[in-house]
Amino acid sequence: MSKSLKSLLSFVIYVAVLLSIVYFTPKILAAVLGTPYPIAAITSSSMWPALKQGDLVLIKNVKQNQLKIGDIIVYKNEQGFTIHRIVRLNKENLITKGDANNVEDKPVDYKEVI
């Protein structure tokens, strides 16, 4: 086999492995962490200094009875998703707040927590 053909074959294998990693990593993480959304990017500074804009976070599924005050959660809302800290737990919902925010968020139903 010629040197250029070996180089081409090596490149094709490298690209195939790289594409496999990019494609399968989120699927593997979703299965291991028990959530359809295993990775999220922080897009605002509302959780500063704990989480900075541009940080990537892994999301793990937890049961409602495992949630506690101080946990950082991800929940669905009208704008998409929010990552904030739990400040109060109620029977029917919970209250969150960004660490850098002055006011609490509106109540979040437990079914909205990712």
Predicted regions and their residues:
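Extended, hydrophilic extramembrane loops/domains of integral membrane proteins
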Residues: 83-114
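Protein maturation boundaries and topogenic segments
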Residues: 1-56, 60-63
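Envelope-exposed proteins and targeting segments
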Residues: 38, 53-55, 69-71, 82, ...
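Extracytoplasmic/periplasmic/luminal assembly and interaction segments
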Residues: 60-91
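A generic structural signal for short, solvent-exposed coil/turn residues
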Residues: 32-34, 78, 88, 102
